[in-house]
Amino acid sequence: MLDKLPVLLAVSVEQEKEALEQGLGKQSTIEVIVCGVGFAAAAANTAKQLSTKPYRGVINIGIAGGFPKRAAIGSIVAASSIIAPEIGAESPEGFISIDELGFGTQEQQARIDRQLVGKLSHSHHVHEGIILSVLTATGTEKTYLEREKLGAIAEAMEGYGVAAAAKSFNLPFSELRTISNEVGVRDKSKWNFPLAFKGIKEIGQTIKEVEQDEYCLFSMSE
């Protein structure tokens, strides 16, 4: 049965895996992999794992930058979709997206698990919206202004790749992230990794609770 299959959680680095597993404990229906940084590595490593056995679905979990006034440091973001804004071509008239070129799409769809997000919202501010997957993290005012126009709530680097891998196996995909810093001019003195990793641990705890209920992940999502 579908609800007996494991769910794959993909994180980019070992520190995220450790925080997530602290919250999950021993959970037989969940598997966690480190898929690497950037959406190329994330796509390849997630697809490699998905090829080994059947899964119920895939969730990309990690830290992210939040756009000011949309997702504050310490909050959680849930993707309604993922956009990779750099895929396309330059021209004298401006950027041309891969969609406009006719070679693919810069957008991947994501599901929001209502039971999981509902439980998380009891103890966290949870924001829903577009999460960007970028090749180069924003670090200047110029880049911030360009990306802010896209209306996203957060910026990360792996969601597009993990989503593409899940799609190739016809599996549902979600992306959940905790906000460690504001998107904008790079200033590590204002980042809060401990709070973000604490949030990842709490996401793990909540996933464990959901899986132990009669309800299971991906049985109630949109």
Residue ranges and their predicted role:
Residues 18, 22-222:
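Glycine-rich phosphate- or other oxyanion-binding loops that anchor nucleotides, phosphorylated ligands
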Residues 2-8, 30:
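Extreme N-terminal starter segment of soluble prokaryotic enzymes
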Residues 12-16:
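Short polar catalytic/cofactor-binding loops
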